[in-house]
Amino acid sequence: MKIVICSGGFDPIHSGHIAYFRSAKRLGDTLVVGVNSDAWLTRKKSKPFMNFNERFEIVQSIKYVDYVMSFNDDDDSAILLIDNVKKAWPQDEIIFANGGDRNTSNNREAEVKGVTFAFGVGGSHKMNSSSEILKSWNN
């Protein structure tokens, strides 16, 4: 079986995230989405717009998503998430799906052995941006 991993803050979730999940699901049999903690969002952009429980529940309700996991890597990577998925599905092929804004030069997760990495999932460019949505909302 092929297990596909997506990760992100999803704060707020938008159409680009849905395209990411849809495309990622096509890569395998099971889609696992890691939702970053509020602490991670605070480090990245000062505070969450939506709290973790809201983001988790919304992601969990999306039809392409089979499992949702929480995670908080102190190094701002998704390496801990990947390790947890590898432990949960030790016999299966693991694919880490990267969105359009990621590549090999800005992907610390590529250090993890035994994982296939897919880039440009959901499109080769970023369709939408949570930060841009919030910026326009604040203005």
Give the role of each language-model region.
Residues 1-139:
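Nucleotidyltransferase catalytic core that binds NTPs
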